């Protein structure tokens, strides 16, 4: 239960108050506020990102690295708005929407939110199951059941409190970091080409624009927007406007660090694909093919690192999806079901799809299409609410933030419409 657990993890601890009072500074002052952004950041390294980044790197080399950098900057702003909403109001995004919108609108938003969670779970479970299949040769159906059991184990951390969950998720994020850092080291990318790809925007034909749209469009995940506002709403509660502003400054640093890590992981996926596949004239779209090629071009260790990264990213992001679903139901319709019941219900569609024998990469693409539908329903209300002084008080967006946010929203929604049309063309 999201709110209850967050509250339980938000005592007026001496460390928090000393940091707000300025008695402790630097990293010691920041430490009590670290955590929420690391949970939200898991959404940015889900298996859908694996497929998109590897396709981009294998087909166009380092050329589209700048798109990942730009996407990360956009995500940084959007996640900061979500966190700020929770800090300013003490409510999550769906709760504010329920108060501000008519009941039929809230019910409609809840339904589309649940569809987003199902699509999210599909992507995460396929990624985790594929990781098990690639690493151990376990058939996909059995692997998906093992992945389901693993996701229940991760949720058990939440019963011990949100600090335990934050530590567990951060640990899993660290595993993915190590896996792709080693992969990048083994791939021996060209440093000059990496820097050019990061800072010199370029395209090469229509297909490169389409892949760039895929990277941008898949960057902002709707469930991460809902969840981040819940992670900050009662974790540390400011008594005054000044304290709330300080809390947001600390949380912004938390977001900056977490998104930097997530961005580095996404960039490393593309870099490794460019250094190995593009260099050897291989266009790789399927994750199982990528795994085999890592083993062939580098070593079995490189292939294993890829499989481990995919498995851990899938497991951790599936648990984050479950937490987001709890926020969506509680916020939009003020109703809850036990977290483990929700987990059980949401694993059924992915397991059925895997059992049907659908190609994993095809299923990942279709899940991203469903997620594309949900972005506007999370992003537009978020910008509306954080630009409203009645709701936000002194933490209202600066005018330039509002303008930039709307431009980003228009860009992301337009790109996702474009991707949906292209998928079914």
Curated annotation (Swiss-Prot):
UniProt cross-references to InterPro entries, sorted A to Z: NRAMP_fam
Localization per Swiss-Prot or TrEMBL: Cell membrane
UniProt keyword annotation of Transit peptide present: no
Keywords assigned by UniProt, alphabetized: Cell membrane, Ion transport, Manganese, Membrane, Symport, Transmembrane, Transmembrane helix, Transport
A GO CC term attached to the entry: plasma membrane
Residue ranges of the TM segments: 30-50, 61-81, 107-127, 134-154, 167-187, 209-231, 255-275, 294-314, 344-364, 365-385, 401-421
Domain of life: Bacteria
Entry's Gene Ontology molecular function annotations: cadmium ion transmembrane transporter activity; manganese ion transmembrane transporter activity; metal ion binding; symporter activity
Biological process terms in GO annotation: iron ion transmembrane transport; manganese ion transport
Keyword Ubl conjugation applies: no
UniProt topology in membrane: Multi-pass membrane protein
Induction of the gene: Repressed by MntR in the presence of manganese.
NCBIfam families in the record: nramp (TIGR01197), Nramp_1 (NF037982), PRK00701.1 (NF001923)
Function: H(+)-stimulated, divalent metal cation uptake system. Involved in manganese uptake. Can probably also transport cadmium, cobalt, copper and zinc, but not iron. May be the predominant transporter of manganese during logarithmic phase growth.
Family: Belongs to the NRAMP family.
Protein name: Divalent metal cation transporter MntH
Organism of this sequence: Bacillus subtilis (strain 168)
């Amino acid at each position: 239960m999201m709110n209850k657990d967050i509250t339980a993890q938000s005592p007026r601890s001496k460390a928090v108050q000393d940091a707000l009072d300025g008695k402790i500074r630097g990293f010691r002052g920041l430490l009590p506020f670290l955590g929420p952004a690391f949970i939200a950041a898991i959404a940015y390294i889900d298996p859908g990102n694996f497929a998109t980044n590897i396709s981009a790197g294998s087909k166009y080399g380092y050329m589209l690295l700048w798109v990942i950098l730009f996407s990360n900057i956009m995500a940084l702003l959007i996640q900061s708005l979500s966190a700020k909403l929770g800090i300013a109001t003490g409510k999550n995004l769906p709760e504010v929407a329920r108060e501000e919108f008519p009941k039929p609108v809230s019910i409609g938003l809840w339904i589309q939110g649940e569809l987003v969670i199902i699509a999210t779970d599909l992507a995460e479970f396929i990624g985790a199951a594929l990781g098990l299949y690639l690493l151990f040769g376990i058939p996909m159906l059995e692997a998906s059941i093992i992945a389901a059991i693993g996701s229940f184990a991760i949720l058990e951390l939440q019963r011990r409190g949100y600090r335990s969950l934050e530590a567990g998720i951060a640990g899993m994020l660290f595993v993915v970091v190590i896996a792709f850092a080693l992969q990048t080291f083994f791939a021996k990318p060209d440093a000059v080409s990496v820097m050019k790809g990061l800072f010199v925007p370029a395209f090469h034909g229509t297909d490169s624009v389409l892949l760039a749209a895929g990277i941008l469009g898949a960057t902002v995940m709707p469930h991460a927007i809902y969840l981040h506002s819940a992670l900050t709403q009662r974790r540390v509660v400011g008594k005054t406007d000044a304290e709330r502003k300080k809390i947001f400054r600390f949380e912004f640093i938390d977001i900056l660090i977490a998104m930097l890590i997530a961005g580095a992981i996404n960039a490393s996926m593309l870099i490794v694909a460019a250094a190995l596949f593009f260099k050897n004239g291989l266009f790789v779209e399927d994750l199982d093919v990528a795994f085999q090629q890592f083993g062939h071009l580098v070593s079995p260790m490189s292939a294993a690192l890829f499989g481990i990264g995919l498995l851990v990213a899938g497991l951790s992001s599936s648990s984050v999806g479950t937490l987001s679903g709890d926020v969506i139901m509680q916020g939009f319709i003020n109703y809850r079901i036990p977290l483990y019941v929700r987990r059980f219900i949401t694993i059924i569609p992915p397991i059925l799809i895997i059992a049907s024998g659908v190609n994993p990469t095809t299923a990942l693409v279709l899940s991203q299409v469903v997620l594309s539908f949900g972005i506007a329903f999370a992003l537009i209300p978020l910008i509306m609410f954080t630009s409203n002084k009645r709701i936000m008080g002194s933490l209202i967006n600066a005018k330039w933030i509002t303008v930039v946010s709307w431009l980003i929203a228009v860009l992301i929604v337009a790109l996702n419409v474009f991707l949906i049309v292209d998928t079914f063309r």
